[in-house]
């Protein structure tokens, strides 16, 4: 019990000494040991890394989960060390509503069939989003969170300890300075020639004793200063090594950032592929749903393409006049070899990107090759008939640059 009380009293005295030193430094009444410029740069870089890591972490969480209530719920589950329940994505919820609407409105109607197709696509988009969130959380958010909750807490603890060691060092310096000043004053008083007519001899004896006491106090203060300096140097070296480890944290964050970009690229590529498949499905059935739809105008002339996009040029493509011998759009899609190009109204087009045919009715394309294109009545405006040699098939307009 006595030992605990002595330790408590000692800790209270140290805390009071540090508080006095800190207060005097703030008011400019005490000297402060300054760290070297390199150490200050390390501290500034560490603080900047911590601040920006927190911002990037929070904003990435917003990107992956825009709902703030859901983020708070996930945070509470993590703090309670409980598994976060599986959550339905917005795409999956939309797919569910569309499927239910198709079942109620009639799955065999054109609208119901389209709802079912879009529902399947939205379901795949929701699954891709779920995979992206899971991958990004593991490969990007978790390392950033581990840095803030692990490495940074260790750095902060050692920095606080270094601050305490510095306050102890400066307090020892101030104590030594005061002891030397008192010793010098006592020495001056002891060297004065006594005047026995006015002063009692015992006062000079007391002055000599005080000088000896201050000598002991100076020796004690110097010893405490050396010990405090040793502790400060040791703690400064430990803190310096931790701060220099921020470079390793940057390398780790860079690797995690590459993983995040990779997962995001995969996610958007999956979304693009799913939507492209959906667009093809809807385009193949559009002729049957809207049999009276025609593309463009019968005028062969068209303005220059330098200021128009590939999508808008489809509106200026010539259309094969409707004749008695021309098969319906559905039949033309199946018997493209029997479709003859119009005598006039064909155009040349340059392929912008490689395109792989999805089925036998489409024409595979290679970038930068030239093909002949034209349109048929009732075709989807996003598609044209392309010819290359003795091969022909449907080609997407967005992959072409129509030439004058």
Curated annotation (Swiss-Prot):
GO terms for biological process: membrane organization; postsynaptic neurotransmitter receptor internalization. Residues 344-404 form the SH3 domain. The modification N-acetylmethionine is found at residue 1. CDD domains: BAR_Endophilin_B2 (cd07617), SH3_Endophilin_B2 (cd11944). Pfam families: BAR (PF03114), SH3_9 (PF14604). One of its GO terms (molecular function) is identical protein binding. Residues 209-239 form a coiled coil. Keywords: Acetylation, Coiled coil, Cytoplasm, Phosphoprotein, SH3 domain. Residues 1-27 are annotated as: Membrane-binding amphipathic helix. Residues 24-291 form the BAR domain. It is found in: Cytoplasm. One of its GO terms (cellular component) is cytoplasm. The modification Phosphoserine is found at residues 10, 404. Homodimer, and heterodimer with SH3GLB1. Belongs to the endophilin family. PANTHER family: DREBRIN-LIKE PROTEIN-RELATED, SH3 DOMAIN-CONTAINING. This is Endophilin-B2. It comes from Rattus norvegicus (Rat). The gene is Sh3glb2.
